[in-house]
Amino acid sequence: AIVEQQGAPXGLGRIINKXK
């Protein structure tokens, strides 16, 4: 979730947060 909060480009947030 931290990556998504930082606004990481691409879909890194999704990869790290499979949960979502």
Curated annotation (Swiss-Prot):
One of its GO terms (biological process) is proteolysis. Capable of breaching the insect cuticle. Residues 1-20 are annotated as: Disordered. GO terms for cellular component: extracellular region. The keyword Protein biosynthesis does not apply. Keywords: Hydrolase, Protease, Secreted, Serine protease. It comes from the Eukaryota. One of its GO terms (molecular function) is serine-type peptidase activity. Its EC number is 3.4.21.-. This is Cuticle-degrading protease-like protein. Coiled coil: none annotated. Disulfide bonds: none annotated. It is found in: Secreted. Belongs to the peptidase S8 family.
